[in-house]
C-alpha cells in the first residue's frame, strides 16, 4: 500500500489556510525529489528511465483485458472537491463568460457552466489527459469549435519523465466531447518523433472569415492550419536536436501573429506576421543572445503594444537570487509596432528588465520562473499600465514596469517568505507557480488565474491587497501520493497526501465536502488514531507531526514528533512510515538504514512546538548497512506484531515481535530480480501474514513476486503486466498492491502507472491481470491502495484525478470477465496489413457495434448499433487514417472482442 508518482514535477509549495492552525515548512531542493524519482523508476542496469516510457506503457496497456463489473455509479469519487491540480490550459467561452474550460496537466479537460462553482470532466478516461493549452474559435457562428494541445515539456531535470502528449484534440460541440486530429498524432509513441508531442500554445485567427486558421506553438516549431486542423504547414522552425525547445504564439483581433522560438532552435527569435505566412524576425539587436522560453502578452486595448518576457537570459536582463541559494536571469521587453513590417524603425523596443522584482531581502519575493517552468506576462484589457508577470508569484505593476516602485505581489507565495522552518507560506487562498490569466469581459476588475493549485478568481485585481476565491469546486485534477482511511468500520474519515497541496482531511462522505489542510507542504504518509482526533501527518523529507483535528479537519493543536536524534539529511523525499495495523499507539519510522518505533503515541503532549523530539522513541540496534536505504514499511494484522520492510537494493526483511524490546531482523530470500531494484510496497494478507506480495517499481525489472511462506521462497506473478519474462520492455511501473481475502477466494490488486489491475487466480508468471475501473479513472496512475476489511471499503488514490472508493462485498462483482471468448464467436479481420479498407466477418445473431482505436486508445471511427444476421460481413473505409497499428473491437451485450490491424 505504499506509493510513488510517475510524472515528475520539480516544484512544490506549502499553503496557509484561513482560520486554521498550520505549521509552515519550506520547500526542499528539486534535486532531492529528482534523485528519488530516478532511483525508483530508472532501469537499475543503465541508471536511466527508459526513453518515452509513458507513451510505450500506454500502448502496451491497450491490449490488457478489462473488467466492466461495476459501472460509474458504483464508484464514489471522494475528491478532494476543493483542491485543484496544475492548470496550464484555461479559457472563457466567448458566448457565455460563466462557461469556463480548464485542462489539468495530468487530469483531463473540465468544463464549468456556472463560473467555476461546479465542473464536469469532458474527456473520457481512455482519452488524452495531459493537457497543456487550449483555444476557442471566436468567430460568429464558429464558437462551438475548441482545440486543446497535449504534452508538457516542463523544464525538468529529468528528460524522460516530462509529459509527452500526442497531438491536438478538437471539439465541435462547445467542449462537451473531444476527438483527436489524426494528422497531429504520431501513432508511434516509441519515439519523440512528432512535432506535436509537446504543445506550448494554440491560437485561432478571429479575423479570417473564409478559412479555419489555427496556429500551434509546438516543440521548436510554429505550425498553421487553414482547415481546422486536417492539415498543417510549418511556418517557422526546423530540425531541432535540442530537447528543450520553447515556443509561443499570439494572434491579434485583426490577424497579426507574434511568435517566439528559443535561442537553441532553428529560426530562433521574435517573429511578426501580418498574414501568418510571411514572417519577419523583429528581435532587437541588443536582445540577450541566449534565452529559453519567451512568453507573449498583447495589450488588448492597443494591440500594437506587445510585451515579451524571457527566461534564462544568462548574463543579461535582471539577475535575481531565488530561494535555496538559487539564481536566475530574466528579461522583460516592450514592443510598439509603428509601421511597415515592424522591423527596424517600424518598431520601438524598450528594455524593462531592470524593473523585474529583484534584490528583496526575502528570496521568495524575487522573480523566479524556475527554469521556464512557470512564466507569463499579461496586460489588463483597459488599463495599459496594469501589467502582470508570473513565475512562482504573480507580480503586478501599475506603471507597466517602467519603474520598480509600483510593483507588488498579488499571488503565489506570501510576501516576505524566506527559507527556514516557519518562515514562509502561500498568499492567502492562492497557490504558487503561475500559468494563465483571464479577465471577465463584463467586468475587467475580475481576473481568473490558472496555476499549480488549480483555478482562482479575484473580484478586484486593482485592490491593494488582492483577495482570491478558489474555483476548485470539483475540479478534480489533484495528484496524490497516498490516501489513508480510518480503521473504524463505516467511518468517512479520510486523509490524502497531495503533491504541492499538503495533507488534506475530510470527515464527510459527501463528495462535495471541503477537505481541510491541517499540514502543508507535499503531503505524505499518515496515520489516523482510532479516536479520529489524533492524526500523524508527514511531509517531504521526513517532517512528522502529531495533530489534533476537529470534526471539520481543522487543526486545534500540534506537536512536531520526528526524533531529534535523527539526522534529517538521511530522510527520503517520501520517508517510510507505518502505524501498527492492530495498535494505534505504535508507529514505525525509518531513518535511511534504521528503524525507529514509538510505543505510546497517545502520551505525546500537544505543546504547539515546531521542535523535533526524542520523547517515546526507540530505535532498533540491528540496522542495515550504512549504504542501504529503507523504502517501505508495513505491519501485519494476523498474526500481529510482524513488520516487513524493503530497501532500494531489492532486499527485504522481516521483524517478529516488532513492538517489543529490540528485536532482530531476518533477511528474506531475495526475489530473482535485478540488484538495486526499488521496493515500492509489500502487501500482507490480513488473515495470514506469511502471504505477501513484493512490488518493485523500476522499469525494466520484474515487478511482482508472491510468497506464501513469509518470504522464504518466491514466485513471479506479474504475468501479462510484463512485456517479457525478464521484466524488460514496455510494461508499466507497478506502485502498490493489496491482498484481500473473501470467504471463498482471494482478490489480488495492483496499482500501476496505467491504472488498477486485479486477479483472483495467481498462476505464477502466467498470471492474467485484468484492468479495473477503466470507465472511471482509466489509465490514470494509481499511486496508493487502502482497504478496510470490516466494511469492505476499497480506496484508490490516483495521480491526476483524486480519490475513488467502492465497497466490494466479494471479488466476483469487482472482477468479472467481460471479454468475449474467441471460442464463442468467429471474428476475422482482413486484409491485414491493409491500405484503404478493412473487412471483418462476424458470426452472431445479436446486436453489435464496432469501434476502431489508434495505439493510444483514441476512438478514430465507430458504428451505430447493428443487427447481426448470423454470418455478417462488413467493409470499412479507413483511407483517412494514417499508417500505423490500430485495433477494432466488436461489442455485444456490453462485452467486447478485439483484433489488431496495420495500415501501410
Q: For the regions a protein language model found, what residue spans apply to each?
A:
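C-terminal motif of bacterial Sec signal peptides marking the signal peptidase cleavage site
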Residues: 13-14
Amino acid at each position: 500500500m505504499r506509493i510513488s508518482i510517475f510524472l515528475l514535477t520539480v516544484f512544490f509549495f506549502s499553503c496557509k489556510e484561513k482560520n486554521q492552525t498550520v505549521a509552515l515548512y519550506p520547500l526542499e531542493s528539486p534535486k532531492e525529489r529528482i534523485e528519488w524519482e530516478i532511483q525508483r523508476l530508472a532501469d537499475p542496469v543503465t541508471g536511466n528511465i527508459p526513453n518515452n516510457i509513458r507513451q510505450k506503457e500506454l500502448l502496451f496497456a491497450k491490449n490488457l483485458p478489462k473488467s466492466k463489473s461495476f459501472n460509474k455509479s458504483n464508484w464514489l469519487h471522494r475528491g478532494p472537491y476543493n483542491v485543484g491540480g496544475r492548470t496550464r490550459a484555461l479559457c472563457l467561452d466567448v458566448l457565455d463568460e460563466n462557461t469556463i474550460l480548464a485542462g489539468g496537466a495530468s487530469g483531463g479537460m473540465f468544463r464549468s457552466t456556472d463560473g467555476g462553482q461546479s465542473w464536469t470532466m469532458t474527456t473520457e478516461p481512455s482519452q488524452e489527459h495531459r493537457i497543456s493549452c487550449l483555444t476557442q474559435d471566436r468567430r460568429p457562428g464558429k464558437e462551438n469549435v475548441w482545440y486543446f494541445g497535449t504534452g508538457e515539456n516542463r523544464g525538468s531535470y529529468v528528460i524522460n519523465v516530462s509529459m509527452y502528449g500526442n497531438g491536438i484534440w478538437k471539439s465541435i460541440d462547445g467542449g462537451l466531447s473531444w476527438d483527436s486530429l489524426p494528422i497531429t498524432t504520431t501513432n508511434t509513441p516509441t519515439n519523440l518523433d512528432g512535432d506535436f508531442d509537446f504543445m506550448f500554445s494554440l491560437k485561432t485567427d478571429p479575423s479570417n472569415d473564409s478559412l479555419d486558421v489555427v496556429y500551434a506553438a509546438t516543440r521548436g516549431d510554429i505550425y498553421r492550419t487553414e482547415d481546422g486542423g486536417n492539415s498543417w504547414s510549418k511556418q517557422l522552425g526546423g530540425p531541432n536536436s535540442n530537447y528543450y525547445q520553447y515556443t509561443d504564439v499570439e494572434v491579434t483581433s485583426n490577424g497579426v501573429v507574434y511568435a517566439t522560438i528559443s535561442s537553441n532552435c532553428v529560426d530562433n527569435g521574435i517573429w511578426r506576421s501580418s498574414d501568418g505566412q510571411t514572417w519577419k524576425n523583429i528581435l532587437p539587436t541588443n536582445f540577450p543572445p541566449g534565452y529559453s522560453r519567451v512568453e507573449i502578452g498583447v495589450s488588448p486595448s492597443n494591440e500594437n503594444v506587445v510585451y515579451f518576457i524571457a527566461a534564462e537570459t544568462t548574463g543579461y536582463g535582471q539577475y535575481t537570487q531565488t530561494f535555496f541559494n538559487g539564481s536566475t536571469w530574466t528579461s522583460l521587453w516592450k514592443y510598439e509596432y509603428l509601421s511597415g513590417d515592424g522591423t527596424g524603425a517600424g518598431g520601438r523596443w524598450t528594455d524593462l528588465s531592470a524593473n523585474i522584482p529583484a534584490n528583496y531581502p526575502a528570496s521568495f519575493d524575487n522573480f523566479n520562473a524556475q527554469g521556464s517552468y512557470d512564466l507569463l506576462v499579461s496586460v489588463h484589457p483597459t488599463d495599459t499600465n496594469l501589467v502582470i508577470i508570473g513565475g512562482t508569484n504573480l507580480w503586478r505593476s501599475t506603471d507597466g514596469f517602467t519603474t520598480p516602485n509600483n510593483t507588488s505581489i498579488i499571488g503565489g507565495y506570501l510576501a516576505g517568505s524566506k527559507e527556514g522552518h516557519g518562515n514562509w507560506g502561500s498568499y492567502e487562498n492562492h497557490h504558487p507557480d503561475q500559468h494563465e490569466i483571464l479577465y471577465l469581459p463584463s467586468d475587467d476588475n475580475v481576473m481568473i488565474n490558472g496555476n499549480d493549485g488549480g483555478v482562482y478568481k479575484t473580484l478586484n485585481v486593482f485592490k491593494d491587497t488582492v483577495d482570491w476565491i478558489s474555483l476548485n469546486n470539483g475540479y478534480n485534477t489533484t495528484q496524490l501520493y497516498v490516501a489513508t482511511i480510518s480503521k473504524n468500520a463505516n467511518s468517512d474519515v479520510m486523509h490524502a497526501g497531495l503533491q504541492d497541496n499538503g495533507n488534506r482531511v475530510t470527515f464527510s462522505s459527501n463528495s462535495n465536502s471541503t477537505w481541510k489542510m491541517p499540514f502543508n507542504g507535499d503531503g505524505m504518509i499518515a496515520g489516523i488514531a482510532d479516536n479520529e482526533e489524533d492524526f500523524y501527518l508527514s511531509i517531504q523529507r521526513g517532517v512528522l507531526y502529531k495533530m489534533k483535528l476537529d470534526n471539520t479537519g481543522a487543526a486545534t493543536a500540534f506537536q512536531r514528533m520526528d526524533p531529534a536524534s535523527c539526522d534529517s539529511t538521511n530522510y527520503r523525499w517520501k520517508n517510510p512510515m507505518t502505524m501498527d495495523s492492530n495498535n494505534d499507539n505504535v508507529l514505525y519510522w525509518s531513518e535511511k538504514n534504521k528503524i525507529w518505533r514509538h510505543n505510546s503515541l497517545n502520551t505525546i503532549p500537544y505543546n504547539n512546538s515546531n521542535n523535533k523530539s526524542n520523547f517515546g522513541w526507540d530505535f532498533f540496534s540491528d540496522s542495515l548497512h550504512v549504504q542501504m536505504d529503507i523504502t517501505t514499511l508495513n505491519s501485519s494484522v494476523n498474526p500481529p506484531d510482524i513488520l516487513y520492510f524493503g530497501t532500494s537494493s531489492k532486499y527485504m526483511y522481516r521483524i517478529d515481535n516488532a513492538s517489543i524490546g529490540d528485536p532482530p531482523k531476518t533477511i528474506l530470500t531475495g526475489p530473482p530480480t535485478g540488484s538495486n531494484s526499488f521496493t515500492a510496497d509489500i502487501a500482507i494478507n490480513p488473515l495470514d501474514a506469511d502471504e505477501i506480495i513484493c512490488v518493485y517499481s523500476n522499469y525494466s525489472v520484474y515487478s511482482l513476486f508472491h510468497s506464501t511462506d513469509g518470504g522464504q521462497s518466491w514466485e513471479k506473478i506479474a504475468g501479462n503486466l510484463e512485456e517479457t519474462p525478464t521484466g524488460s520492455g514496455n510494461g508499466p511501473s507497478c506502485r502498490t498492491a493489496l491482498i484481500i481475502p473473501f470467504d471463498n477466494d482471494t482478490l489480488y490488486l495492483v496499482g500501476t502507472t496505467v491504472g488498477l489491475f486485479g486477479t483472483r487466480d495467481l498462476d505464477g508468471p502466467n498470471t492474467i491481470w485484468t484492468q479495473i475501473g477503466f470507465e472511471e479513472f482509466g489509465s490514470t496512475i494509481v499511486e496508493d491502495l487502502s482497504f478496510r476489511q470490516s466494511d469492505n471499503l476499497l480506496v484508490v488514490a490516483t495521480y491526476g484525478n483524486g480519490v475513488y472508493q467502492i465497497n466490494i462485498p466479494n471479488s466476483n462483482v469487482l472482477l468479472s470477465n467481460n471479454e468475449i471468448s474467441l471460442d464463442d464467436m468467429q471474428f476475422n479481420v482482413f486484409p491485414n496489413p491493409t491500405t484503404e479498407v478493412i473487412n471483418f466477418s462476424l458470426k452472431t445473431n445479436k446486436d453489435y457495434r464496432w469501434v476502431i482505436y489508434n495505439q493510444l486508445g483514441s476512438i478514430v471511427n465507430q458504428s451505430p448499433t447493428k443487427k447481426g444476421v448470423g454470418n455478417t460481413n462488413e467493409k470499412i473505409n479507413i483511407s483517412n487514417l494514417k499508417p500505423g497499428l490500430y485495433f477494432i473491437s466488436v461489442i455485444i451485450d456490453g462485452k467486447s472482442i478485439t483484433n489488431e490491424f496495420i495500415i501501410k
